Amino acid sequence: MITHRKRQHPIRVHLLTVLIGSLWLAGCASSNTASSQANPAAADAYTQLGAAYLERNNLPRALNALDRALDIAPRHAEALQALALVYQRQGENALANDYFQQAVDAEPDFTRARNNYAAFLYGQGQFDPACEQLETASQDAQYANRSQLFTNLGQCYLALEEFDDARARLQRAQSIDPRNARGYLMLAELEYSQGNYAQAWAPLQSYLQLAEPGQAALEMAVDIAHARGDYSVAADYQRQLGTN
């Protein structure tokens, strides 16, 4: 008889790394913060200039441009969160936290800022406040990356080992975007880590159909297939592991 031993796989992915491609730099839409009345066009222009420098990792010039924007409009939410990102890259975590907080205070509906603030908090190991920011952000039904946001929220609850909340948020991510590969993988890993092999199989199969599988996903597939008694399927995944 083949005995099956559950293998634990890490279910955390560095949230900051995942989010880096979705930072506010993409698009760089100007903010509608009400207090940007002194010269909003100039504040927006300096903010976009700062964004361009930040994208090229020219942090001193980004800092200078964003300071100019905030001289004109001290509560310009885009400039505040951009400055937070600059300080985050420089390792000035206290300043980054302060400017992220100012950004979401200035514009409470600024979902991208909350998402980026949550990434920062998660990277600092502050999982509870990160989840709080993501919960607030998740209420924005018009947010373009809402499925990713719910996936991030599920991951945040995983870090807190609040598995029911994590499962609910990951399932919500899939209902919003059925092609969210990362969400399927995280849901499969959650169920697998809890020994729920039957529940892990379907999301794992969805992930394998949508993405190029890595070693951890294939090993999980081998284990679950063995647990299901699907030895030929397990052997197929084992062969893929050998060529991966």
Residue ranges of predicted features:
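Bacterial Sec signal peptide processing site at the extreme N-terminus
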Residues: 22-45
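Post-signal-peptide N-terminal segment of Sec-exported extracytoplasmic proteins
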Residues: 37-98, 132
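Register position in tetratricopeptide repeats
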Residues: 55, 89-90, 123-124, 140, ...
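Structural marker of alpha-solenoid helical repeat scaffolds
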Residues: 38, 72, 105-107, 140-142, ...
